[in-house]
Structure formats: C-alpha cells, structure tokens
Amino acid sequence: MRKAQIGNATVSGLTIGGNPFSGFSHQGKERTDEMLAFYTDDQIKATLRASEEAGIDTFFGRTDDHIFRILRGYWDGGGSIQWFAQICTERGKPDVWRDWVKGAAELGATGAYLHGGVVDNWHASGEHDNFHEAVALMRSLELKAIGFAGHKPDAHGWIRDNLEVDFQMCSYYNPSDRSKSAHHVSEGEKWHEEDRQLMLDMISSITTPVVHYKIFAGGNRPIIDGFEKLGNAIKENDICCVGMFLGDDPEMITKNVSLFEQYCDTVEKPVA
C-alpha cells in the first residue's frame, strides 16, 4: 500500500477510523447497539491487530477514557499502530478539549486533530481564536502531525487560508448542522450528493495533505461508488480514513485494502 508524509509522520494510504468502536453508527439506534455489543475491548484490539497485518498503520480515534484504556492495553501487548487523536469537547465542558490534547500527547499520540463537529461549530460561531490556540497547543506538545476535521467546505476554506497545519480532514458529507452545538446528532442525518460535490471542490483547492473521510456516508452509500470518487479526488500525499464494522464481514479490512489499492494506489496527482 502507498504511504503518505503527513507532517513528520509516515502514514499508510488507508487508515482505520474509530466510530464503530464507540457506537457512532450513523445508521440508527439498533445499528449503534449492534456495534457496541460487538466491539468489546478484546474485539477492538483484534481489529487493530488485523489492520496492522493488512498494512494499515494508523488509527484515527477518540480521546476518551474508553479509547485511552484500549490503546494502552494494545500497545502494552505489543501493538504498534499509530494513533491520530480526535480531540473533542464534552456537553457542558466546552473547554475540556485542552485537557484531551495534553492527555493524548502524554499517552503517545502520533498526531491530533480537532473533531469535525467542534470545527464546524467554532467556525460558525466565529470562535477563530480557538483555532489559533489549538494550533499553538498541539505544536507545543511536539506531536508529529496536527490538523482539523470538518464537514463544512467553508470551514476548510478558512483553515486553508489562515492556519499552518499538517493536514485537513475533509468529510464527504455534512450529515447535521453543528452551528449551535458541536455534539453528535443521531436523528435526521442527511447524506446529500451536493454536499459531497462541494467538499470535493474544496479538496481540490487544498495544498496540504487531506484525510478523506465519510467517503461512504457513514455506511449509507455504496462502497464502490465511494472508492471511485475517492480515486478521482485523492492527491498524491492524501490518505483516507474508513471505519469498519467486522460484525458485518470478518474480511472487511482486507477487502477494503484491496479496493483502496485498486482505485487509489496508482494515483500520482500533483497537489493543485
């Protein structure tokens, strides 16, 4: 599998995301409960191990006690997957992200980025000082790669024009409005083709490496279509993050690696 240079980190072209591990199914309560029941601590560790065996060397996952515990145990048991830490706020604790950044660096994160809902909310609220503070804090902790996720093209345009980051993590879809709250909304999510096209247009204008995510609309859109769009959009030093629910298919990791190699490994496009 191809590799990309993200800041000072070398990252596999396909990476694994943590939403299924934490029950963020984007497919309703029954599906969420199914993921939570399947992904015990041991099953998550086995999935990370299988990812490494398939050539995936990086995990994009939350900063919370659950994931901290799993990663600590996984690394203590000999695992070596890199972790790009997703920095979140909490309900009633809008400033706690600073603690999670520090905790992630202390635990051993390779990279860190602000959660897409937080980024959407900060940008919509005009809280641009938070972006500058986040960059300064992450840089001070000597993380190898720092960036921001987001579902809104205009937020990514502002980041592109105003911040020095190592990557921008661009969601192909914008399932819910985060202008009033940064937190996850499980009901009424929307997966519109026009949102995907707007983000693809934005991606083409970004010169730093892009992490393409939600390419399958949280499992709500066809897999091959997602990989075809990715293959057309991905630039030479871009990567992709995909959450995988092995409860559906124990071979999902190797199948996704094969599809990524088929559609993306031959891509040698210069940055726009």
Cite the ranges covered by each PLM segment.
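Hydrophobic faces of well-ordered beta-strands that scaffold small-molecule active sites
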Residues: 12-18, 58-61, 81-87, 112-114, ...
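Surface-exposed cleft-lining segments at the edges of enzyme active sites
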Residues: 116-127, 139-145, 182-188
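Glycine-rich phosphate-binding active-site loops on the catalytic face of alpha/beta enzymes
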Residues: 116-118, 167-178, 233-249
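Active-site-adjacent beta->alpha loops and helix N-cap segments on the catalytic face
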Residues: 63-79, 92-98, 118-136, 153-158, ...
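Histidine/lysine/aspartate-rich catalytic loop segments that bind and position anionic ligands
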Residues: 159-190, 201
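Active-site beta->alpha loop and helix N-cap motifs at the rims of alpha/beta catalytic domains
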Residues: 35-125, 146
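Structured C-terminal cap/extension of enzyme domains
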Residues: 4-6, 10-13, 31, 42-49, ...
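Glycine-enriched alpha-helix->loop->beta-strand junction motifs that scaffold or abut catalytic
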Residues: 77-80, 106-110, 140, 161-169, ...
